[in-house]
Amino acid sequence: MSLLEAAPKRLGGFGLEGTRAMRANKVYDKLAFLVGITVVSAVVTMPMVSRSTSLQKLIVPAMLLALGCSLAGTFKPALAQKVAPVYALLQGVVLGAISKAYATAVGSSIVPMAIVATAAIFVGCLVVFRSGLVKVTPKFVGMISIASIALFACYMASMLGLNIPGIRDIGGGRAMIFGVIGLAIGIGSLFIDFDRVQKMETNEQMSNSVEWYLSFQLLISLVMVYLNVLRILASSQSRR
């Protein structure tokens, strides 16, 4: 996330072809397009994943490819325009499978509840940021970055076989703790992304490819928020 601080100094990282002033509304238009791809992909995947064993075998590869796209688009901003739609498509497959698992375990209503909650969190965070109540400082960025890396390391360690209690649970107290931590990081990431948009918009030398980079980063943050909202809702219902 500290990439934001370096971006204005590394204009070549985005490419200056067809340069024009970046506008925030263009970023959010592209975000809506990417979210649309993700939602369609997830909706198509959900009813198929329980019936097709071949599709189930593709979930982990799709997850790894989506991770690769997210890293490529984050550390090579000029690639964001190409990898963002691919990431959205792959992440939709992953989210569809995960959402189906939660719907089966807890109830089908959990998915629309999580979608509405995610949208409300996004709008709420944007309103709070624009009101000036939250200031994105280097210390804030550093804290969210460290927390993100730590949580990512925990998930990777779990995938490699390390037993971390609660990290894979759908519901329960430990899953709730991981969900709250993940949601806090996701919300912090949204604030950082909003700050990026605001800062980039004032730099008229930036290429319009920055819009794709910023919308891509916003999508990654939204995915994190949605997944952790699912965990929190599932944990809340399992404790009743």
Predicted regions and their residues:
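A hydrophobic alpha-helical transmembrane-helix feature that marks the membrane cores
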Residues: 1-240
